[in-house]
Structures are given as structure tokens and as C-alpha cells.
């Protein structure tokens, strides 16, 4: 009998949410996603020590200023880890822009181009890279500009329908709505502690976004992310892509039985609405207390891990 991971691959592109080379070799995903937390964890893996040393040596050659060396080495390390992962996957690597730039469009564009330049100098073309940006209004505007310049983006930390709609209207390549973190919020802030997979608030959110995109003919890829259990993944089978942590990839691979398509749109394509204005975006996003909390929390957490990574680099310089 076929295992659930093999079955899922027939209807959804499976992406690995990790920087672990061993997991890449084992589960052979199409694409891979990283973020500051994943890079920080990957930096502890012994096989990656040479990538850290190489990034530090390179940074010393770029500048004599210690603060600039930290920035350069951190960027280079993220790209070095991405390069190692690209050797193991046929598709794309997602590399994230510093979360502390989430409300600065100009700085986000500059950082994205810096990361792309480092990949290009290593012989990697733009069609194998996705630049990850937080789904703030400023991040979405940065992505809109980058897409026009041939740099595809992955808009992350997406929790509200307003964020999803603004991303589609900006023509971004891909969004990563966070299923599990939505569930976390409802469990922590409501009376209900258990949800059937089909009623899981994160699953409901991604389903709504998927149906809206397909109904209006938006090309933006929907990639569900941040899963807490197998039920969420099975309930979103048919989503364009799903990025899954190694522990859940393992669980899927060890579970037998078919996975049935749950997401599909069979209706007619309807006209797109007028794009959200900045004021409309903020008003609609702020009507969702979960999304407001989780976006801010996600940015803070990624910024903390970015700081830890820089501290580790600083101590080695």
C-alpha cells in the first residue's frame, strides 16, 4: 500500500520546511523554505561549520568595520545554507529578508537584491530563488517592486484575508499562510481547545484564500505552512504547495493509505475586485485580532533569532 507522503505528492507539491540536509536527502522535496529560526538551528549542525567559517572569511574581505562584517557574514551564511540545499532539490529555495526591515519597503528591496546578488555570484539563477518577506503593507509593496524586476517572492507571516488579498493584487509569486500558528492563537484565546481538521481555524483560513484566488484567477501560489498535526495537512491536500517540517514528513511517510484531494475550484473565473487601498488594508487586517497578534509576534520572534544569529557570528569574527 502507498504511504501518505507519496500519495500527497500526486496532488500537491511538497516542500521541506527545514535547513537540515539529512532531511532533504531522506524526503526529497521539490522546494525548501528557510527563515531566521531555521538558519539559526542549521548553524548548530556540525556539517554546516565550514559554511559559517567561509561566510566569516568572506565578510572580513568585504569590510574592516565589525558591524558591517556581522551583516555581511549573516547574509552570506543564509545564502551558503541555501546553496547546499539547492544541491539536493530540483526546485527553489526560499531565503528570508531580515524581519527587522518588515516595515521598510526601500530597505527590504535593497536586502532582497543583496541576497539575490550573492546567489547569482554563486551561479544560481533567479528562477531557483524565492525571497521571503513578511506580509506587512510595506513588505507587500517591496515584493510588488521586486516581482517587476524578475525577483520572485514568498510572502510569509500571513494570517489575515486582507494580507492574502493584497498579496494577490500585488502580483506576488507565492504566499505562505500559517495554519498552525492560527490554531495556536484560537486555542490560547478561546474556550475551544480541540478542533476537527475541517474546522481547524488555520485550515478554514487557507481554504478560503485558496478558493478566492482560484475564483478570481489570481496566479499567486498558495503554500500552506506551519503545521501542527497530520490532520491539517490531509485537510489541505490539493493546495498548490504545502511546506512541511521533517517530523511531519516522517509521519506522512510512515502512514499508509491514500490521501484524497480536498481543495479544488471548479467554478467559473470571476472578475477581480478593485485593489485594496492602504487604508482599506489596515482597516480590514485590524478587524482580525488573531492576525494582528500573530503578525507582530512572528516578526518579533524572527527578529530575536536574527539577533541570536548575529551574536553567534559576532563572537566568531
From Swiss-Prot:
Its subcellular locations are: Cytoplasm
Reactions listed under catalytic activity: D-sedoheptulose 7-phosphate + D-glyceraldehyde 3-phosphate = D-erythrose 4-phosphate + beta-D-fructose 6-phosphate
* Top-level EC class: transferase
A biological process (GO) of this protein is: carbohydrate metabolic process
- State the pathway, as annotated in the record: Carbohydrate degradation; pentose phosphate pathway; D-glyceraldehyde 3-phosphate and beta-D-fructose 6-phosphate from D-ribose 5-phosphate and D-xylulose 5-phosphate (non-oxidative stage): step 2/3
Q: Name one GO molecular function term.
A: transaldolase activity
Which CDD domains does its entry note? Transaldolase_TalAB
Q: Could you list this entry's UniProt keywords, alphabetically sorted.
A: Cytoplasm, Pentose shunt, Schiff base, Transferase
Its biological function? Transaldolase is important for the balance of metabolites in the pentose-phosphate pathway.
**NCBIfam families linked:** PRK12346.1, talAB
Say if the entry is tagged with keyword Cytoplasm.
yes
Which InterPro entries does its entry note?
Answer: Aldolase_TIM, TAL/FSA, Transaldolase_1, Transaldolase_AS
Show the active-site residues.
132 (schiff-base intermediate with substrate)
Q: Does the keyword Cytoplasm apply?
A: yes
Q: What is its EC number?
A: 2.2.1.2
What protein does this entry describe? Answer: Transaldolase
Q: How does it assemble?
A: Homodimer.
SUPFAM superfamilies from the xrefs? Answer: Aldolase
Which family does the similarity line name? Belongs to the transaldolase family. Type 1 subfamily.
**Entry GO terms, CC:** cytosol
